[in-house]
Amino acid sequence: MRVLLSVCGTRGDVEIGVALADRLKALGVQTRMCAPPAAEERLAEVGVPHVPVGLPQHMMLQEGMPPPPPEEEQRLAAMTVEMQFDAVPGAAEGCAAVVAVGDLAAATGVRSVAEKLGLPFFYSVPSPVYLASPHLPPAYDEPTTPGVTDIRVLWEERAARFADRYGPTLNRRRAEIGLPPVEDVFGYGHGERPCWPADPVLAPLQPDVDAVQTGAWLLSDERPLPPELEAFLAAGSPPVHIGFGSSSGRGIADAAKVAVEAIRAQGRRVILSRGWTELVLPDDRDDCFAIDEVNFQALFRRVAAVIHHGSAGTEHVATRAGVPQLVIPRNTDQPYFAGRVAALGIGVAHDGPTPTFESLSAALTTVLAPETRARAEAVAGMVLTDGAAAAADLVLAAVGREKPAVPA
């Protein structure tokens, strides 16, 4: 048996797919993954066949680059859907089920292909701000009508904008393969009941949300840390880690620079993750060390605190490691996870994406306090570690209930 995983998103989304692929492999199920070109090396490491689908995002979104004009945004939006119809049919050949992770627009195309082939379809998204709910508004960088505060209305507007942007391309491509048009484009992409790969302590399922919360899909990372990093860790007290992952755009380099200054003022050493923005150290002093991608599960257990952007992936790894966190949210679901860190008492949520020396100094005082460390370690013991196993069981249970393929 083989299952197709289709991922459209950042490295964190790819890791969600990798965790599920690993669990399915343990159950004797083969997988292949449609994923962005940048995922090639990671998928080769874990032995998952890779079907490149998408654009090299980390090359498109560099620090200081202006956003594309509206017509280019619309072209890219159409491409997101088009690429699924072009690549997924071939990738799904011989597969018994399809799981989409990440971008909802891509998921509408992936589900259409699964529908055509009569395959069970699951959609997975790790954040509640992407699932319509009367309790949480849409992601905070979504455009809204001035003066509208009713959460239900905000979600209705979100669904209408989504349909306007992606519906024409979706329904044109569906017609080409003999499928009827979709009216509720936003709801269609979610599938019959989304899988929610988020930990119930860190991101509890809200009432009235029809989803299956499996717990986080996390692959145990057994890779050793690089020798140079091990030497830096051994040379002094636990440092503070700074990293913004696959975030990019204006202000990240400045935020990292201010963070280094604030950490040094506390008498602490620094580890700086370069990330997609390719951050650089401010100088050549021996109290700072720059790294590329490493085993963060191992590293986070050996640092004094973690300063990060609040993505779902980084948030789950840091929380599971029991390390205090200072979250500087920038967009999408990051303010939600920053708020959860503060609510759980395992760190501090910075007010906005533009830190100052003063704001970070105050936050670090709380983050580095012994009581914050104790609370972070206590919460780490509550985090579920078998989310991918629960998801794999759901997928395999659905394989025997697939619908017949739609005739050409």
Swiss-Prot record:
InterPro entries linked to this entry: EryCIII-like_C, Glycosyltransferase_28, GlycoTrans_28_N, UDP_glucos_trans
Binding residues for devancoaminyl-vancomycin: 76, 80
Top-level taxon of origin: Bacteria
Any matching Pfam family: Glyco_transf_28
Catalytic activity: dTDP-beta-L-vancosamine + devancoaminyl-vancomycin = vancomycin + dTDP + H(+)
Pathway: Antibiotic biosynthesis; vancomycin biosynthesis
List of residues binding dTDP: 10-12, 246, 293-296, 309-314
EC numbers: 2.4.1.322
Any GO BP annotation: vancomycin biosynthetic process
Transmembrane domains' residue ranges: none
UniProt keyword terms in alphabetical order: Antibiotic biosynthesis, Glycosyltransferase, Transferase
Enzyme class: transferase
Binding site for beta-D-glucose: 13, 103
GO-annotated molecular function: hexosyltransferase activity; UDP-glycosyltransferase activity
Miscellaneous note of the record: In A.orientalis different glycosyltransferases are involved in biosynthesis of the vancomycin group of antibiotics. GtfA (AC P96558), GtfB (AC P96559) and GtfC (AC P96560) are involved in biosynthesis of antibiotic chloroeremomycin, while GtfD and GtfE (AC G4V4R9) are involved in biosynthesis of vancomycin.
Protein's job: Catalyzes the attachment of L-vancosamine to a monoglucosylated heptapeptide intermediate during the final stage of glycopeptide antibiotic vancomycin biosynthesis.
Family assignment from sequence similarity: Belongs to the glycosyltransferase 28 family.
The protein, known as: Devancosaminyl-vancomycin vancosaminetransferase
Gene designation: gtfD
